[in-house]
């Protein structure tokens, strides 16, 4: 009689990749863009207000919609990563962010811009938690502090650089370019992540449901 049994994920040896810093750089691209976009729009709001004929209260939704969408998505990211794979979720978030960036630049009405800022926020909200998970799986425990330091640097650098970068772009070009600038950087990150990031073999796919009541109260 032949006995077969499924291997316990805990029994699978964890082999850390040799190109760990390349992986760290790849996933930091998206996180840096996402954090920059929390503040890059702020300096362009007066220009957007005039172009879109919006009031002061209305134009603030361009910033608020992005932040709210990001915050709502973050709690779902861990469940989605376990169900579909962290690499897929990261790539999907980056693609959504880039699509949202492109259509934000083409928007010619406030409702349209807010809708695509929400799409941007959904994509960005999945990047930060997924990067943390990828870094923890990529680096051994003794090096995770340095990896998280890189992550923290991106989180701090984005909001600091955003207003300066946004002001320069608006003064020298036009407001759509604060969104279009994401495209070449994001495409580089997309190619890098697709080539160097791989889910570990022990990652379990969970089939549990979502706490929809919890998500409702969060919203």
Model-derived segments and spans:
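Helix-breaking motifs and short loop linkers at transmembrane-helix boundaries and internal kinks
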Residues: 51-53, 85, 106-112, 140, ...
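Conserved MFS/SLC helix-loop-helix module at the cytosolic interface between two early adjacent transmembrane helices
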Residues: 72-111
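Interfacial helix-cap and linker-helix signal at transmembrane-aqueous boundaries
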Residues: 48-49, 80-81, 165-173
């Amino acid at each position: 009689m032949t006995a077969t049994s499924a291997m316990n994920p805990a029994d699978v040896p964890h082999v850390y990749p040799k190109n760990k810093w390349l992986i760290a750089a790849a996933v930091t691209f998206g996180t840096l863009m996402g954090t920059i976009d929390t503040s890059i729009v702020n300096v362009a709001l007066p220009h957007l207000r005039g172009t879109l004929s919006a009031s002061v209260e209305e134009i603030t939704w361009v910033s608020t919609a992005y932040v709210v969408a990001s915050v709502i998505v973050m709690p779902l990211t861990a469940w989605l990563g376990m169900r579909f794979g962290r690499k897929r979720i990261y790539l999907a978030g980056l693609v959504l962010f880039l699509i949202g960036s492109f259509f934000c630049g083409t928007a010619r009405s406030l409702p349209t811009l807010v809708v695509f800022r929400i799409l941007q926020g959904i994509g960005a909200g999945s990047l930060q938690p997924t990067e943390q998970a990828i870094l923890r799986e990529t680096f051994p425990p003794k090096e995770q502090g340095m990896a998280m330091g890189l992550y923290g640097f991106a989180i701090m650098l984005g909001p600091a650089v955003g207003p300066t970068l946004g002001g320069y772009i608006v003064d020298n070009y036009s407001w759509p370019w604060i969104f279009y600038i994401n495209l070449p950087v994001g495409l580089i990150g997309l190619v890098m992540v697709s080539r160097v990031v791989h889910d570990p073999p022990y990652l379990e796919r969970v089939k549990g449901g979502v706490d929809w009541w919890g998500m409702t109260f969060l919203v």
